[in-house]
Curated annotation (Swiss-Prot):
One of its GO terms (molecular function) is metal ion binding. Belongs to the cytochrome b family. The cytochrome bc1 complex contains 11 subunits: 3 respiratory subunits (MT-CYB, CYC1 and UQCRFS1), 2 core proteins (UQCRC1 and UQCRC2) and 6 low-molecular weight proteins (UQCRH/QCR6, UQCRB/QCR7, UQCRQ/QCR8, UQCR10/QCR9, UQCR11/QCR10 and a cleavage product of UQCRFS1). This cytochrome bc1 complex then forms a dimer. One of its GO terms (cellular component) is respiratory chain complex III. Its cofactor is heme b. This is Cytochrome b. It comes from the Eukaryota. It comes from Nothoprocta perdicaria (Chilean tinamou). Pfam families: Cytochrom_B_C, Cytochrome_B. PROSITE patterns: CYTB_CTER, CYTB_NTER.
């Protein structure tokens, strides 16, 4: 029998083992679609971004005009820009759902896969932040000023670090140039880390909704899950295209239609919606260094999740008390996101502080305590 090139060719063999003959648990649900959707969410901004970079000018006097030029004069420039900007929003929607699924079903016990995933999230956040600065509107400029200024809270080296990042004594032309360079580079770094992420995943195989070992019951990825992923991609592309074509500025800030002006501060400086939960946690602490530490902890706390797993069951499928806690955490994150978009005044200050406190309390204390209690109830006999 002639050898199958798909299984013998050095390069095709890798693709085959990752996407075609990959043994997958037969019972994984639609929640397992988001990994492949994230791949699509990465490819789309890279392709549109390369096309935008051909027309964009990374100079403070020309950046705003070059974005307007792309939207007005470049063939389908408006479409490329809208797909690129809203692609970031859908990237974050997918990654948050992907993390939520990993948390709910105990996938974090694959520690290497989980940790590389968090590194991917941090890299994505950095990419989105530097990208938001590039149109050089009011919110771009002031967002960059406020967020980079947070590094000055670091003792001893803070101020030097900020001036080094700025390339001067304020956010100016050198800052914009280096942010453009970073925004071009980081998505390719994300693509590289994604391969590492997948390599670790394929070492152990996928988790499943029951959280049990499924080696005895696996099916090939293609055609079963490739078809399922295709459906997921179709269902994701509908709201994505609807947003990009009908209401492309829905998730943006109106302030960004005004060119950057260092002499006029916007009434309410806020980041894009996907950072609002962390921004609310930052603002809830009246001390600068404390706020920065809380901001860092709000994301870095994910590294501690595998260490805080006390349950004898992996998944939350059969753990109703933990399920209630999980959905409380989700509701809490929605509250933080909403508070982050509101001005700093009563009652939003106290709501933000209570939501921030409950965020850390749920993750660090209530989940391990509940898991221990469930062990007692479930395994008492």
């Amino acid at each position: 029998m002639a050898p199958n090139i798909r299984k013998s060719h050095p390069l095709l063999k890798i693709v085959n083992n990752s996407l075609i003959d990959l043994p997958s648990p037969s019972n994984i649900s639609t929640w397992w679609n988001f990994g492949s959707l994230l791949g699509i969410c990465l490819i789309t901004p890279i392709l549109t971004g390369v096309m935008l970079a051909m027309h964009y000018t990374a100079d403070t006097s020309l950046a705003f005009s070059s974005v307007a030029h792309i939207c007005r004069d470049v063939q389908y420039g408006w479409m490329i820009r809208n797909l690129h900007a809203n692609g970031a929003s859908f990237f974050f929607i997918c990654i948050y759902l992907h993390i939520g699924r990993g948390f709910y079903y105990g996938s974090y016990l694959y520690k290497e896969t989980w940790n590389t995933g968090i590194i991917l999230l941090l890299t994505l956040m950095a990419t989105a932040f530097v990208g938001y600065v590039l149109p050089w509107g009011q919110m771009s400029f002031w967002g960059a000023t406020v967020i980079t200024n947070l590094f000055s809270a670091i003792p001893y080296i803070g101020q030097t670090l900020v001036e080094w990042a700025w390339g001067g004594f304020s956010v100016d032309n050198p800052t914009l140039t280096r942010f453009f360079a970073l925004h071009f580079l980081l998505p390719f770094l994300i693509a590289g880390i994604s391969i590492v992420h997948l390599t670790f995943l394929h070492e152990t195989g996928s988790n499943n909704p029951l959280g049990i070992v499924s080696h005895c019951d696996k099916i090939p990825f293609h055609p079963y899950f490739s078809m399922k992923d295709l459906l997921g991609f179709t269902l994701l592309s509908l709201p994505f295209l609807a947003l990009a074509f009908f209401t492309p500025n829905l998730l943006g800030d109106p302030e960004n239609f005004t060119p950057a002006n260092p002499l006029v501060t916007p009434p309410h400086i806020k980041p894009e919606w996907y950072f609002l939960f962390a921004y609310a946690i930052l603002r809830s602490i009246p001390n600068k260094l404390g706020g920065v530490l809380a901001l860092a902890a709000s994301v870095l706390i994910l590294f501690t999740i595998p260490l805080l797993h006390k349950s004898k069951m992996r998944s939350m499928t059969f753990r109703p008390m933990s399920q209630i806690l999980f959905w409380l955490l989700v509701a809490n994150l929605f509250i933080l996101t909403w508070v982050g978009s509101q001005p700093v005044e009563h009652p939003f200050i106290i709501i933000g502080q209570l939501a921030s406190l409950s965020y850390f309390t749920i993750l660090l204390f209530l989940f391990p305590i509940t898991a221990t209690l469930e062990n007692k109830i479930l395994y008492q006999y």
